């Protein structure tokens, strides 16, 4: 009986010290959509801002390409027709995965402007 109580106590103590799972934020970024080999990236992109997974409403679509400094690799893109938006400014929403090369698991992609910001990396 004492052994069982001790074991239960030790398991509870261990579980309470387990690291919390990382929260992955849903963000919105705007930038120039480029194809690099088999990867799609957003270059000259804005800083990520908290958002929802839904498509950006018209009020949040910029009228001109923003001058951002970030690059994001886009993943989970099979549902979106990215070749149609290549070399254009797009608003991307999705799950933000911060890393050496930050990624966004795309939940929404909307064309904003039919061109990219001047000086956007090719």
Positions of PLM-derived features:
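Conserved RNA-binding domains used in RNP assembly and mRNA/RNA metabolism
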Residues: 14-122
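Hydrophobic h-region of N-terminal signal peptides that target proteins for export
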Residues: 2-18
């Amino acid at each position: 009986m004492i052994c069982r109580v001790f074991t239960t106590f030790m398991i509870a103590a261990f579980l309470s010290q387990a690291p919390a799972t990382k929260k992955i934020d849903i963000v919105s970024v705007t930038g120039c959509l480029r194809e690099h080999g088999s990867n799609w990236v957003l270059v000259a992109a804005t800083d990520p801002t908290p958002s929802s997974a839904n498509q950006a409403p018209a009020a949040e679509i910029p009228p001109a390409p923003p001058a951002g400094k970030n690059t994001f690799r886009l993943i989970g893109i099979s549902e979106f027709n990215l070749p149609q938006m290549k070399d254009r400014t797009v608003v991307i929403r999705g799950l933000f995965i911060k890393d050496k090369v930050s990624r966004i698991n795309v939940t929404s992609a909307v064309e904003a402007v039919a061109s990219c910001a001047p000086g956007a990396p090719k």
